[in-house]
C-alpha cells in the first residue's frame, strides 16, 4: 500500500477526509491498510497569515472525528518547517513543534477527546537545514521529548507515544546562482533526515 499525503486548505480538510474514505471504500480497499495524511494545521493561519483562528479547537475536533474513518491516516499537522524556511535555529523549530503538539493534545483532551487517539493522528512536518549532525540530533530529541509529553497524558496505549515525522529539505538556504551547490545541500539534508 502506497502512502498518500495531502495538503489542502484547512477549511476543506474534513471534506477531503470524507471523499478519501468514500473513494477507498468504493474501490474495496481495506481502510486499516490505507496510510497517509491530510494535513490540517490549526496554527498555519496565525503563523503564516497573521490572522486569528479562534474556532480551531472545534474545527480540529471535527477533523479528528472525520479521520476516524481512516485509521491509518494522520489528520492533524504540526508544520514546523515554516520556522526552518524562515531561518530559525534548530532548537527554535523543535521547541515550537513540541509546544504545538502539546497544545493540540491539551485543547483536544479538554473537549473530551481521548489523548491516545489525538496523539496517533498527529504528524510532525520538519524542515531540514544543512547542519548535518544537529539535524540528526533534532530528530532523536524530538522523538524522545514527544514520547515524554504524550506519556504525561497517560495514554491507554504506549503506541501513542510514537512520533510520526515527515521531513523536507529547506528552502531557506538555496541559491538561484548555483544549482550544483543546491544539490549538495539537499543531499546533506536528506542524509541527516534518513
Feature locations, PLM:
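Conserved phosphate/anionic-ligand binding catalytic regions in large, soluble enzymes, centered on
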Residues: 181-194
Amino acid at each position: 500500500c502506497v502512502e498518500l499525503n495531502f495538503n489542502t486548505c484547512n477549511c476543506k480538510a474534513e471534506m477531503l477526509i470524507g471523499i478519501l474514505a468514500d473513494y477507498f471504500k468504493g474501490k474495496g480497499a481495506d481502510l486499516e491498510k490505507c496510510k497517509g495524511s491530510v494535513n490540517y494545521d490549526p496554527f498555519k493561519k496565525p503563523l503564516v497569515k497573521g490572522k486569528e483562528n479562534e474556532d480551531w479547537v472545534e474545527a480540529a475536533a471535527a477533523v479528528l472525528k472525520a479521520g476516524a474513518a481512516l485509521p491509518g491516516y494522520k489528520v492533524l499537522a504540526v508544520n514546523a518547517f515554516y520556522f526552518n524556511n524562515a531561518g530559525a535555529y534548530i532548537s527554535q523549530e523543535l521547541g515550537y513543534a513540541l509546544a504545538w503538539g502539546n497544545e493540540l493534545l491539551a485543547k483536544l483532551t479538554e473537549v473530551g477527546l481521548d489523548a491516545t487517539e489525538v496523539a496517533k493522528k498527529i504528524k510532525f512536518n520538519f524542515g531540514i537545514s544543512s547542519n548535518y549532525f544537529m539535524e540528526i540530533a533534532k530528530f532523536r530529541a524530538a522523538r524522545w521529548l514527544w514520547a515524554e509529553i504524550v506519556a504525561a497524558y497517560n495514554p491507554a496505549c504506549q503506541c501513542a507515544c510514537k512520533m510520526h515525522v515527515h521531513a523536507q529539505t529547506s528552502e531557506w538556504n538555496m541559491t538561484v546562482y548555483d544549482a550544483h551547490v543546491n544539490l549538495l545541500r539537499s543531499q546533506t539534508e536528506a542524509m541527516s533526515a534518513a
